[in-house]
Amino acid sequence: MPSDFFLQPLDGGPRVPVGPGQTVIGRGPLLGITDKRVSRRHAILEVVDSQLRIKPIHRNPCFYQSSEKSQHSPMETQVWSQLHPGDSFSLLLDKYAFRVFSAESEVEMECTLRNSQMLDEDDILSEMQKSPVVNLPDKTTGASQLQGSPEITKTKCPTIDPMSSSGECRAFSEHQPRPTQRKRILPAWMLAESLSDQSLSTPAEGGDKDVIQRSGKAGTCEDRTPGNTSWHGKKRLSPSGNSKSVSAEQDPGKKCRKADQEGPGVSSENVPESSSSNIVKDPDVDIVKTNKQKDGILIEELGEVSKHKAATKPTTNEEGESCARVQSKSPPEKSQGCHPESSSAPSSPDALHTDTADPVLGCSEESKVRRTACMYGANCYRRNPLHFQHFSHPGDSDYGEVHGTDEGVIGDRPECPYGASCYRKNPQHKMEYRHSALPARVALDEDDDDVGQPSDDEDEEDYEPTDEDSDWHPGKDDEEQEDVDELLKEAKSSLHLKH
């Protein structure tokens, strides 16, 4: 039989149905209360004639609150009190409050909710029917404005100057697609550089001599064709009106470093005077600069290879001859590194330092300190480059020369106590100790009876016998010998008696 009443906890939780008849409520699983202040038999609920009533049976009172009042009032014990739908009661003053619901009240509440929802929907529909009449002009005007805005953007944005940056133009330009081609605007420092290039290119009208002198000061290469070098500088003068441009056609491996360092000087001659006010021709300057950077990288790599070859060439005679050979086989700039006073415009200090240091390294290879031999030899498993710099291994030119003989080792070392007869095979031991042959001992005379006595070259005063220090007594040895003989005789006699 379905229950007519339900208890809804105000603190949250599932509803508790109240069956017909009496129901004891309190601490337990029915209401989910575990507080010790609530008794297991705290009150009794009873359903009589479709009405619910409560009777407190514990000394701690229960509290009642009607749907019309906002305060809890204590109920008398052992007295029945009616509970109507919507009323609430609590087992304690501040906790465990429950509200009473009935099935009929639930149906009535659902009906009222449906009615209220229907009324709300009717109100909304009536408002919606009235609102289009009032709001249609606004919507139509808004739509017309939205439709007209693309036309405004199309008509207004192209007419606005691109240099003027205003907030309205930016807002309209966001809707407009970006053009495929855009005019390039160079920064101020590039414009200043182009003007300086033009000012440098104007004195080129004086003649070919001025151009050649200026290119020499700027660091361009002159025509040099030595027998053993592969450096070729080609110059070509192209007369064009009032000005003459000098263009150096050089391969990536045949371009001098000075021309790369003095980039503005060369670019000033390549830029004609007609490009004084045009900004469109400025990308050519960028192309020239990128080509120069690529050529400079290749030149530096080739320069390092040539320096390495020049530094590693063997020197057969004196240091002066080897330096002269390095100068003759190196490019012209390398010879300028050996003799800086001969060059009119030296290059950067770093390049000059490296050029002057490489021949010195090549000349000083003869006086290189030999490395010590590794104690592990061919069985060495180390791969550290520093280890190979300090120690030599089998296959190296200086391996085996350090510890092969004791005479070739430089430095003072202690003498091995075993000398030449040392049986140790550790090369580290041979490097740390000398193994020279011990001097032959002086042969003693066969007729010499003074064995164990001090030699003649020592002082006789140190070995003079004295009565005080001597422990020798003449009579003691004879007495000891007699005692030994007596003991032997006694032993023999005892043996004969036993047999």
Curated annotation (Swiss-Prot):
Single biological process term from Gene Ontology: regulation of epithelial to mesenchymal transition
Q: Where is this motif: KBM?
A: 182-191
Q: Which Pfam families match?
A: FHA_2 (PF17913), zf-CCHH (PF10283)
Enumerate the UniProt keywords alphabetically.
ADP-ribosylation, Chromosome, Coiled coil, Cytoplasm, DNA damage, DNA repair, Hydrolase, Metal-binding, Nucleotide-binding, Nucleus, Phosphoprotein, Repeat, Zinc, Zinc-finger
Broad class of the protein's primary localization:
nucleus
Q: Where is the composition biased (Polar residues)?
A: 141-152, 239-248
Q: What is this protein called in UniProt?
A: Aprataxin and PNK-like factor
Q: Which organism is it from?
A: Mus musculus (Mouse)
Q: What is the lineage of its organism?
A: Eukaryota, Metazoa, Chordata, Craniata, Vertebrata
